[in-house]
Amino acid sequence: MDLKRIIFSYFYHPLRFINKSYFGNRPRLRVLIYHDISEDEESNFSAQIAWLSKSWKFLSPEQFSSIIDGKSPLKRDSLLLTFDDGFISNRRIAERILNPLSIKALFFVVSGFVSIKNKKLCSNFISDNIYPDLKSNKVPKGWKNMDLVDLSYLIKTGHTIGAHTLSHAKLSKLNKKQIYKEINFGTNFLEDKLGIKIKHFAYPFGNISSINQDSLMIAKKRFRYIYTGFRGDNSILEPWAIRRDAFQPNDSKYLIGTFLEGGADAIYKKIINHYHQWENIT
């Protein structure tokens, strides 16, 4: 953990005290993002989930959607757990940790990453698309993709599959036709192969520089729920602007707590306002 994140973690207790003192028992709704979790990191992730469960309730994607749509009340601080990209470790985590705890997660899958069988091609795809700053020969050996069998297992055990484009492209760099293909062709593949209807979509990368108005408009025509990488609370929110907090298994519980108490939310206010302006432009 870098120095800034270590320092930031010390704000957890003051922020928690302030929130409890000034906002009382007003419930909060937040979404977590994880990516690959290696076997060496599994115990850390398990400890994070155990710690979070003491103060937060984990919702299923269906419960989360019902709250976002105003059909169910938000009664207490709640979390939705999401995983991005479609790494094979996600199935292992579901089997070993989530399923025994009856925690249901939302897995955003890059459809072009599914069913790559050659290890070299898999590493090349990760380097070219998911982590473009990482050379293919530096991709960790454990970074592999789920296939359709793995995704079917997740569905069978009560989890939800979401769309994450065809190739994990930075949508802001594409024209409308290319954006349409990335979003819709990728989703069509997953729906056809898995026999499901996909309602949830997450932007690749998730930052404001990777998104534009065209990608928002095209995604809105296909999906009810659209997820960003902007940190923030979701208790009163449009379903096309869902905030998420990204974490790693080696993050301390106090760093996680600081973010969930809203320690970085103000940083994203201007970004979120800019994103909302796109929806208002006719």
Question: Whereabouts are the PLM-identified features?
Answer:
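Short acidic, Gly/Ser-rich segments with clustered Asp/Glu that frequently serve as metal-coordination loops
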Residues: 85-92, 97
